[in-house]
UniProtKB/Swiss-Prot annotation:
This is Small ribosomal subunit protein uS19. HAMAP family: Ribosomal_uS19. PROSITE patterns: RIBOSOMAL_S19. SUPFAM superfamilies: Ribosomal protein S19 (SSF54570). Protein S19 forms a complex with S13 that binds strongly to the 16S ribosomal RNA. It comes from the Bacteria. The keyword Ribosomal protein applies. One of its GO terms (biological process) is ribosomal small subunit assembly. PANTHER family: RIBOSOMAL PROTEIN S19P FAMILY MEMBER (PTHR11880), SMALL RIBOSOMAL SUBUNIT PROTEIN US19M (PTHR11880:SF8).
Amino acid sequence: MARSVWKGPFVDGYLLKKAETARGSTRAEVIKIWSRRSTILPQFVGLTFGVYNGQKHIPVYVTEEMVGHKFGEFSPTRTFHGHAADKKAKRR
């Protein structure tokens, strides 16, 4: 079920403060965040966030198309190594 419209998008408070200070500074640096559940807002466009995936921070550059999605969607937590090869088919 989707979030109620009257509640508005969820964003952690510290994330808004970090983005605001990054907008004010001239240095382009990665903003490390652990909040994968936060919604990407229009004021985040053009910033780079390091989204934590459980092991390391994955750099995510926010574009217009990402607005409305969650940060966790752009930082995969699992690595797919492919399915195991069939041993019978390999011998032939």
